[in-house]
Amino acid sequence: IQSLGSNLLYVTPENPNRDGEIVNPSVQELTVDDAIALNDPVRAPDIAGAAPERRTAVTCTSEDRSHSTQIVGTWPSFFSITNSPVSAGAYFNNADELSARRITVIGSTVAESLFPESDPLGRQIACNGVPFTVVGVQAEKGGAFANPDDVVIAPLSAVENSITGYGEVSAISVQASSSETTDDAEGQAIAILDERHGTTEGTRDFEVFNQASLLDTA
């Protein structure tokens, strides 16, 4: 988690209706439009970037090898926001997102499982039967918290088109402009989402985590 950077925030859906008590009768999911709103430099001057994530479990295959993992559909800015460099190859870009290209950056665990003795770059993997071409391998992050190396990352548009369908997103990664502005960025994110979702403290259908709270959760 520490490798993600002290200026990372993570927004996830949260249902405030617990134990049979209806606190918010109109709970909303997180959407791509929420991520777009968080990128507003006027409303959120201390947010450097925000990227939606659509995550789902998949089984990926290459020739006679198979590996169960999760695919993350997201924007190109995800890599810089989450401090996720590649050790080989390249990232996908905005043109790839706009054209819904079926290309992927795979984590080191996936690379070792599907291509133990060969270079994965340029090779094709099928995730739930959908072909993706490997253009990059994410640098190893390590750690036992949700194994960040066991992942397949692809353009959000491609994942929605071919695997998940369209709708809500699983989370939004948010990068504050610096570690010193993380609290301000968190406040700006909450204010924007409160306005969009019609919520207040106690009825929020989302939760914002910072690095400290993520470490407590782990």
Name each model-derived stretch.
Residues S77-F92, A100-E201:
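Mid-to-C-terminal secondary-structure elements
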Residues N7, H67, E168-I172, R204:
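Short amphipathic alpha-helical segments
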Residues T59, G122-A126, E207:
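Residue-level detector of beta-strand face positions
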Residues I1-Q70, T74-S80, A95, E112-S113, ...:
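Hydrophobic, regular-secondary-structure patches
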Residues A189, T200-A218:
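Peri-transmembrane interface segments
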Residues E29-V32, G73, T104-V105, I153, ...:
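Short aromatic/basic micro-patch
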Residues T69, F132-T133, F206:
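Small-residue-enriched segments and motifs
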